[in-house]
Amino acid sequence: MNAKALYKKKALRDRRKLRIKSKLLGDALRPRVSVFRSNRYFYAQAIDDVKQSTITHIDGRKMGFKNTQEDAKKLGVLFAEELKKAGIERVVYDRNGYLYHGVVAAFAESLRENGIAL
């Protein structure tokens, strides 16, 4: 990709991100689960927007998981366990401007399958 195409791709993602964040708000009972995917790894965190603090997080890089759908499902299982330890059963899913496809969708489905209501 040339520089102009990369700039446009990032600008479109930033616009989607702002549009989504204006509608989502997490609190202590129903935190916002924000995901980030790089070219190699996948990260997620549960955020209480009222207190502006992170409740729990998961880092695929430290656990040796790559940015694949299979690894996203495994991370979803582990993250669901972390959320249940914190006493959280319902969350607001913030896809962070990414399209709901591939690893972003696989992670969300894995959370649902493990008892977290999105």
Swiss-Prot record:
The keyword Cytoplasm does not apply. This is Large ribosomal subunit protein uL18. Belongs to the universal ribosomal protein uL18 family. It comes from Helicobacter acinonychis (strain Sheeba). HAMAP family: Ribosomal_uL18_B. The keyword RNA-binding applies. This is one of the proteins that bind and probably mediate the attachment of the 5S RNA into the large ribosomal subunit, where it forms part of the central protuberance. The gene is rplR. Part of the 50S ribosomal subunit; part of the 5S rRNA/L5/L18/L25 subcomplex. Contacts the 5S and 23S rRNAs. GO terms for biological process: translation. It comes from the Bacteria. Keywords: Ribonucleoprotein, Ribosomal protein, RNA-binding, rRNA-binding.
